[in-house]
From Swiss-Prot:
<keyword id="KW-0472">Membrane</keyword>
<dbReference type="InterPro" id="IPR029061">
    <property type="entry name" value="THDP-binding"/>
</dbReference>
<feature type="transmembrane region" description="Helical">
    <location>
        <begin position="67"/>
        <end position="87"/>
    </location>
</feature>
<dbReference type="GO" id="GO:0005886">
    <property type="term" value="C:plasma membrane"/>
</dbReference>
<protein>
    <recommendedName>
        <fullName>Putative uncharacterized transketolase family protein y4mO</fullName>
    </recommendedName>
</protein>
<keyword id="KW-0786">Thiamine pyrophosphate</keyword>
<keyword id="KW-1003">Cell membrane</keyword>
<keyword id="KW-1133">Transmembrane helix</keyword>
<feature type="transmembrane region" description="Helical">
    <location>
        <begin position="31"/>
        <end position="51"/>
    </location>
</feature>
<dbReference type="InterPro" id="IPR005474">
    <property type="entry name" value="Transketolase_N"/>
</dbReference>
<keyword id="KW-0812">Transmembrane</keyword>
<feature type="transmembrane region" description="Helical">
    <location>
        <begin position="115"/>
        <end position="135"/>
    </location>
</feature>
<keyword id="KW-0614">Plasmid</keyword>
<dbReference type="Pfam" id="PF00456">
    <property type="entry name" value="Transketolase_N"/>
</dbReference>
<comment type="similarity">
    <text>Belongs to the transketolase family.</text>
</comment>
Amino acid sequence: MAQIGHNISLPERARRIRRHALRMGEVQGQGYIAQALGIADVLAVAYFHATTYRPDDPEWEGRDRFLLSIGHYAIALYAALIEAKIIPEDELETYGADDSRLPMSGMAAYTPGMEITGGSLGHGLGIAVGMSLALKRKGSRSFVYNLFSDGELDEGSTWEAAMSAGSYKLDNLIGIVDVNQMQADGPSLGVLNFEPLGPKFEAFGWYVQRIDGNDIDALVDAFDNARQHRHPQPRIIICDTKMAKGVPFLEARERNHFLRVEPQEWAEAIRIIDAGVTA
């Protein structure tokens, strides 16, 4: 992993990622902030424990590739890239503005450290399969991570990619599914029931782990297991997360896929996060 501030704990990294995301949300007064709060622990472990990269050289050939399939989660990835010092912190004030490198839906052409342009849901895993196959053929030892959502499990292209990854035995591919149980149209299982999820990926030849995606210790173990797994097969970490994790009054909102938050509520949310882990 990158050599960045090893004296800072992973829970503190997650707290900072949440804070960066809230500050960006405050700039626009709205956004996919619940997803960012929910996935912050995953991103903290990914960027400060698991992946290899150089903050001052985002295009370094030897890096692990971290793909964000879910384009509307861009605010979460920006927060992690800011914490990783790939993007300067002062840029968060430009979030969503004209000519910003931080558009509301991620654009790889604009943003350092963003490997792909996501957004048309269901395509990220297929891109990850192609990258993984190409890296293997080049003899690279880099891993490809693909973060995708439970909503993307509604897309047939996701399952075509899952089958292909198993067929090609892509042991350099690590999928991460954010199962937060909410989509734009309502609760995920009410839109299309994808359970039982683990056995489906196992049937396609994947090594499967399912964990609490807001448990730092469980995430560390899962990422370590995925990287160290010796069988020639792709790996997937199914992360059950809580939307708006860490800010109780936002967690309690029934429909929090896209949040519009009053000015005083942003301040309260940041105050709650600042009262959390500090070391």
